[in-house]
């Protein structure tokens, strides 16, 4: 998962008229979450945990997640490296993002997959409640009272969540680690 910019539908035609050609396709998906975790996913998750010596970690506060913050960004840099247009984050950027965004997370919507032998992060999922309805109610304005709608949306039990960042180390991709992440989100 990678946050990207949005382009209006007429942009591609306009760019082609100007002589540009398409270099890459991007896809966005809306995933409907079932009422419960499918039995097959639970079995796959348990097999993957045993086979690779992994554990699923959840957090209650910023203090508990901070020891893993740098590791998450190392995993992000490695897992996103082959993606089109990705530039590795510098240590200065990582430090900035940790200080800026860790306090704003909903810790119950953060999942880490950690290798038990060395406590290394092999996968992560960071989600937040969808803020679209709150932004509509606030009419796109934070002040004077729009922040109340946003705060309510962030604090209440979400009906829809947005996956902000998800990544798995390349050596663990296509091995079921993503099943562990999604089992926890469901």
Where are these regions (language model features)?
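Acyl-donor-binding surface of acyltransferase catalytic domains
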Residues: 1-60
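A conserved beta-strand-loop-helix scaffold within acyl/acetyltransferase catalytic domains
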Residues: 58-168, 183
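Short flexible/disordered coil segments
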Residues: 32-53, 85-93, 121, 149-154, ...
């Amino acid at each position: 998962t990678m946050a990207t910019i949005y382009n209006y539908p007429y942009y591609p035609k306009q760019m082609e008229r100007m002589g540009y050609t398409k270099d890459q396709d991007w896809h966005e998906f809306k995933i409907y979450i079932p009422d419960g975790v499918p039995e097959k996913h639970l079995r796959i998750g348990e097999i993957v945990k045993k086979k690779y010596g992994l554990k699923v970690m959840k957090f209650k506060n910023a203090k508990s997640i901070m020891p893993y913050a740098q590791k998450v960004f190392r995993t992000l840099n490695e897992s996103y490296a082959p993606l089109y247009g990705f530039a590795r984050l510098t240590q200065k950027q990582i430090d900035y993002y940790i200080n800026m965004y860790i306090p704003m997370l909903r810790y119950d919507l953060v999942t880490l997959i950690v290798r038990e032998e060395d406590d290394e992060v092999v996968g992560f999922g960071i989600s937040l409640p969808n803020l679209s309805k709150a932004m509509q109610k606030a009419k796109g304005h934070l002040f004077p009272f729009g922040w109340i709608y946003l705060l309510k949306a962030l604090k209440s039990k979400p009906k829809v969540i947005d996956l902000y960042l998800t990544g798995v180390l390349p050596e663990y991709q296509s091995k079921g680690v993503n099943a562990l992440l999604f089992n926890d989100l469901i």
